[in-house]
Amino acid sequence: MAAKQGSFRHGILEKRERLLSNNGFSDFRFTDIESNDLLENENCGRRTRLCCCCSCGNLSEKISGVYDDAKDVARKAWEMGVSDPRKIVFSAKIGLALTIVALLIFYQEPNPDLSRYSVWAILTVVVVFEFTIGATLSKGFNRALGTLSAGGLALGMAELSTLFGDWEEIFCTLSIFCIGFLATFMKLYPSMKAYEYGFRVFLLTYCYILISGFRTGQFIEVAISRFLLIALGAGVSLGVNMFIYPIWAGEDLHNLVVKNFMNVATSLEGCVNGYLRCLEYERIPSKILTYQASEDPVYKGYRSAVESTSQEESLMSFAIWEPPHGPYKSFNYPWKNYVKLSGALKHCAFTVMALHGCILSEIQAPEERRQVFRQELQRVGVEGAKLLRELGEKVKKMEKLGPVDLLFEVHLAAEELQHKIDKKSYLLVNSECWEIGNRATKESEPQELLSLEDSDPPENHAPPIYAFKSLSEAVLEIPPSWGEKNHREALNHRPTFSKQVSWPARLVLPPHLETTNGASPLVETTKTYESASALSLATFASLLIEFVARLQNVVDAFKELSQKANFKEPEIVTTGTDVEFSGERVGLGQKIRRCFGM
């Protein structure tokens, strides 16, 4: 039956005819068996060639991807080795220690019977050998103490178990439970945190000796052989680590504190310079908002100082194990004072973090108001960073402070900023909303009260309105024609900045509604936001002054460290009429005045 022209079936048949005319490249099955076989053979051949090509292409892409990944890993490994060559040396040292222990075991020295327990020597080298000598000594002591105490306790329990006869296995099992419970509970005590590894070794050794000795009946032999092999591995590890390119935890702690001083100084300068340049982030990085590592130099500087607490505590706990070495020539060296000094520095770094928060804030002060305090803000930032860098150099050189007061210049800069704030404080607040300034002894119009400024007030008149205000408000010249119209014009002619936009520029409120005093909501809200943006400048300035106040704690902590660590006296260099104390310059006249207490 012929299909009706224009129907769906008619369209399908036409499509089939076109495909048949194109040598049968169709997915339809035909009734001609020979033609079907021919078409299927051709299609299979093409599909096979296509699959082979695709497989080869995918394989080459995978090989290329593996090669690129391997090359990237090799590049990163090379960069890591170049950045800190000590890592390469440490890797070579641990390989050498393992080789020495293996040779001793192969040649069955010093005792041929110990070869069957040789795995304990290898495990000791792998576990005890640490990056720094202090960490190696700490772990070696913990392992030795845990092994000795566990061995003695296991031997005692083994002797007691023989008294229980058939209940010997039950007694050993109960003793393992009790010892495991007590040791685990004790290592959770805060003061026992430093011996956590020793408790683990204690449990492992106790269980191993008790179970192995129970099977073989040789408790004493197992305990002695284990102790000797652990001593062998620990001795080889300590010897290789101490006598071949030693890496000291105390030196790392010393360098870390110096680095923190430089980083905080860099962040402080970056905050002040960025704020005065009206630096604006087009988009605040999400890593900064979530307090993660970021490449922002200002953020990276103070964050590294704040986040170094755990590293400092770890290095200090290892440094106290190290013997006198290098410039640290005394026993009981005051490593804790390094951490204390760094803690005082972190107290200042928190203020720098708050300064950076002012730059990231959405409420920003206009540029013209920042420029009013530019010189004073700049000087405080420069002097504060200079002080931190100088203290960092003193720590690095291990020198005491000279006779010059390091805080003099930065305190002077902070006082100048404080005086400028007191003088220009009307720029930091909305003075029209001051309650104390709006009080009058008798009711009168605001215009009449302001007009008293130009004439001498008679005795029966109220004093001028600014007599109730602060000294800063009194120096503000308020024009007698100031009113709603002038305030609107001032808002309309506010300059815009391409670097950073202050918060009031974002207002979009309808100005047609009137309030009870005749001012529109737009003007009232604009005044509110303008006052908030000005207060952001006051916040930044007050944080700088707070930073200067906290520097006293840093200087005091450094003086305490320099006394306990017996830092050397600063070198005195005389040049003409000036006397220089290891980088500090003091005029001769100033030195004479200080000698006489002037």
UniProtKB/Swiss-Prot annotation:
- Keyword Membrane found: yes
Q: What happens when the gene is disrupted?
A: No visible phenotype.
Residues spanning the signal sequence: none
Subcellular location per UniProt equals: Vacuole membrane
Query: Does this entry carry the keyword Transcription regulation?
Result: no
GO MF terms here are:
monoatomic anion channel activity
What InterPro entries does the record tag this protein with? ALMT
Q: How does it sit in the membrane?
A: Multi-pass membrane protein
Membrane-crossing segments per the record: 88-108, 117-137, 144-164, 170-190, 194-214, 227-247
What is one process in the GO biological process aspect for this record?
malate transport
Q: Which UniProt keywords apply?
A: Chloride, Ion channel, Ion transport, Membrane, Transmembrane, Transmembrane helix, Transport, Vacuole
Assign the protein's first listed, main location to one coarse class: membrane
Highest taxon, organism lineage = Eukaryota
Q: How is its activity regulated?
A: Slow activation by external aluminum.
According to its UniProt record, in which tissues is this protein expressed?
Expressed in hypocotyls, leaves, roots, flowers, sepals and stamina. In leaves, expressed almost exclusively in mesophyll cells.
What GO cellular-component annotations does this UniProt entry give?
plant-type vacuole membrane
Q: What family does the database annotate? A: Belongs to the aromatic acid exporter (TC 2.A.85) family.
Question: What is the purpose of this protein?
Answer: Vacuolar malate channel. Has a higher selectivity for malate than for fumarate. Also exhibits a weak chloride conductance.
PANTHER family, alphabetically? ALUMINUM-ACTIVATED MALATE TRANSPORTER 10
Q: This protein is called what?
A: Aluminum-activated malate transporter 9
Q: Which organism is it from?
A: Arabidopsis thaliana
Lineage of the species this protein comes from: Eukaryota, Viridiplantae, Streptophyta, Embryophyta, Tracheophyta
